[in-house]
Amino acid sequence: MDERTGRQIMSGFRLNLREGLGRAIDHGSKINFTFDGKNYSGRVGDTLASALMANGVSIVARSFKYHRPRGIFSAGSEEPNALVTVHSGARTEPNIRATELELYEGLEAKSQNRWPSVNFDVMAVNQLPGKAFSAGFYYKTFMGPSRPGHKATQFWWFCEQLIRRAAGLGKGASQADPDKYGRMNAFCDVLVVGSGAAGISAAERAASAGAKVVLCDESAAAGGALLSSSELLDGAPAHDWVADRLAELAKNKNVTVLTRTTVQSMFDDNTYLAIERVADHVKTPGKHQVRQRAWNIRCKSAVIATGAIERPIVFAGNDRPGVMLADSARRYVVEYGVSPGRAVCVFTNNDTGWLAARDMAKYGVIVETIVDVRKDVPDAIRAA
């Protein structure tokens, strides 16, 4: 709450959508979903994270040990906080990042590691004796001396049961998974991991030389950071440049583009394992459709073009809801048309914080303050 104006500044909301804003979503659509049993709506193209933010949901989880409130911190696979459980029964799947979960009609998601609710968690009492709960405290605190007829290990076994109930995040299903899974083998000259500017350019260059190329990206849409960029590439807006290049790659029979595909392991002899989320963006897979597919990719060479992850500035309370990465906040504004709050303060030590503030202000977000730890900020950045 802003003490001066009385406005709620921490809760997100959907901006007035217009051309150039909300590039990833269908402005005229509506998708119904539930979070912790409450009904909400979003747009086609939303992630669960962007839809929750648009509906003003600020607390989405609780921390592992102290059960401190957690909000959405990022916009991609680096998200540490917004872990949810989806589906029910035998299809229950815990620890899914809300930032990667594509919204679909009828989605049912639940927060984790809280009781009875994420907004009122009884286990938050753990914050009171927090200093006594140092890392590994249970390995010494409950190891009492042996007594006749009562061994120390027996006392630990008793305490261990209680600790295990309090530990962990989501709970998995106990029944057999009813979904189907597939496997594919692929052989190529060049594997490109990541479809930003570097990845697309590498795929283009290799394909133009006659090489067989596989281009993988973990997101639903290729383009990486360019999809929310306001910069120009070859005289065109970055997202238009991406669309043009992907259209050209699609015409080349030697190029395979795999979206929703995470390259997660590298083995000997240039062999890579990738997991494609074939039907995780729908409520249930089709009758003969696999839910996920494992790709064993053998290549002659690989280009790792996965980009960079913004590092947060460390300060007391930076784990609280309402604190998030600046570039991620910009992504929510530009790609999903969602403001992270009624008013924003940008805390930065480099130029990208100023550029994020510029883009957010351009689309109607109130940027109250920019705090830069540097003594000298380039005039060109201030002017931007």
Residues of each region from the PLM?
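Residues forming the flavin
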Residues: D2-A384
